[in-house]
Swiss-Prot record:
Belongs to the ALB/AFP/VDB family. Transmembrane segments: none annotated. The keyword Transmembrane helix does not apply. It is found in: Secreted. The second albumin domain forms a deep binding pocket that contains palmitoleic acid (in vitro). Palmitoleic acid is most likely not the physiological ligand. Instead, this pocket may accomodate the covalently bound lipid moiety of Wnt family members. One of its GO terms (biological process) is protein transport within extracellular region. N-glycosylated; more than 90% of the glycans are sialylated. Disulfide bonds join 77-86, 99-114, 113-124, 148-193, 192-201, 224-270, 269-277, 289-303, 302-313, 340-385, 384-393, 416-462, 461-470, 483-499, 498-509, 536-581, 580-589. It comes from the Eukaryota. This is Afamin. Residues 22-210, 211-403, 404-599 form the Albumin domain.
Amino acid sequence: MKLLKLTGFIFFLFFLTESLTLPTQPRDIENFNSTQKFIEDNIEYITIIAFAQYVQEATFEEMEKLVKDMVEYKDRCMADKTLPECSKLPNNVLQEKICAMEGLPQKHNFSHCCSKVDAQRRLCFFYNKKSDVGFLPPFPTLDPEEKCQAYESNRESLLNHFLYEVARRNPFVFAPTLLTVAVHFEEVAKSCCEEQNKVNCLQTRAIPVTQYLKAFSSYQKHVCGALLKFGTKVVHFIYIAILSQKFPKIEFKELISLVEDVSSNYDGCCEGDVVQCIRDTSKVMNHICSKQDSISSKIKECCEKKIPERGQCIINSNKDDRPKDLSLREGKFTDSENVCQERDADPDTFFAKFTFEYSRRHPDLSIPELLRIVQIYKDLLRNCCNTENPPGCYRYAEDKFNETTEKSLKMVQQECKHFQNLGKDGLKYHYLIRLTKIAPQLSTEELVSLGEKMVTAFTTCCTLSEEFACVDNLADLVFGELCGVNENRTINPAVDHCCKTNFAFRRPCFESLKADKTYVPPPFSQDLFTFHADMCQSQNEELQRKTDRFLVNLVKLKHELTDEELQSLFTNFANVVDKCCKAESPEVCFNEESPKIGN
């Protein structure tokens, strides 16, 4: 298998799909051919990702059998493209071969998907994915010396194992992202294995790779969840806002062309159609670079790079400069006498234009806030256009926009103040209690992960000049992850209402939630309050995870207690751990002190 070189197959966070059509222009043909060659050269990696995401429980050995089968299929089709099997969509071929593996569908409980065909089967495989991967064993780790020996002796096997383990734990992450992570992983391994201090090098250089994966995972799940719960129109408006901020000089007609190119058929990437996702990501990149003069002045150098590098370059490029002739506000949406008539003539285009004009004038606002303003404007016109004097009614729209922005800003300022007062750990415990109270039905691991991500939003953003947009964007991703990708996911009535009622106002909805009154706590178990000397032998990170899990389980068990009472019990726990780990006999100390924690 050839060395992966897909670092640039990303555009912002836009791994989106569109219908596959044969290229007609020379530039399109060149782009299609280079993308096709990449897919052919990396069929093994692509198969690993698809199989590991569709059948997360499958063993590495089972995956190897499918890889061998897919490579043979590719070789047959390259030798004779007229074979009947070569006219099928790659994702259909892959799923057919997965279903044909003897005993596999029954062993891993997906035989019901194999009884379906085409779109129904693809959707079934998608719904079979599990975001909570607690059923998988811990991520296998190697001693740095062993890892380097494995890399030097069998690089291909190490990379295959790595991609398999990462893909099965991230079933909704798009293929280009996972391939890019594999590129970065190999770069880290190759560089650090030549260093004398391999441990420090691997630990330090692995952090940005992990952060990259987490960030893209959250975003992609968020947008796929929006697509499945709210439909294409919401995704369309998300990208109008994003692209208008990034490229404020773009013409509206060109923007809509790009947005449609980007968001028209998002299904492929969200479903896990790996080949289609890669093809269409490349097409989006080509679209941008073929129209760069009318899109942005910041991407010229990026577009001169080859396909593997240009995407990453565009991601890292700054927002384009605001056009000098762009007024601070666009009056035609609030001052014109004909607003209602223009809205009625073509509502979708009218509100798309409003989103475009408002977003490119407000690069300081978050995407959720821009969508809230669009919703407020829609609601305002729905009311005003039914009055005797519509212009006199919607003339004050800007006041409404400023009012909601001020409200959102105060929420962020209050949360950042909490962070400053409580510190990182204190804020995390605050959110672990809060999230567990509103969604106690979630698994302990999922709640711990959500709490960590919420705290990351504040530690990342609360010291930045663009604090508001940063916090609001990242916190919205956390709630998107809580809601999940699957449209059929249910947690409890209050949470489900926030997840499914209004995408733009999802976060304010969550902020207003109280403890779930429908929840029935599990029976009391003294095991929760029983600790042993191994607590003292845990490394810092492991001890922190145990502490976080204890707090979540404590809230689940004593759901009726106030935050202050829960904090008091948690303080008792922390004091016992501190006391016993300093004792001459930690085990004896834990046996004596543990029962007192829950009292």
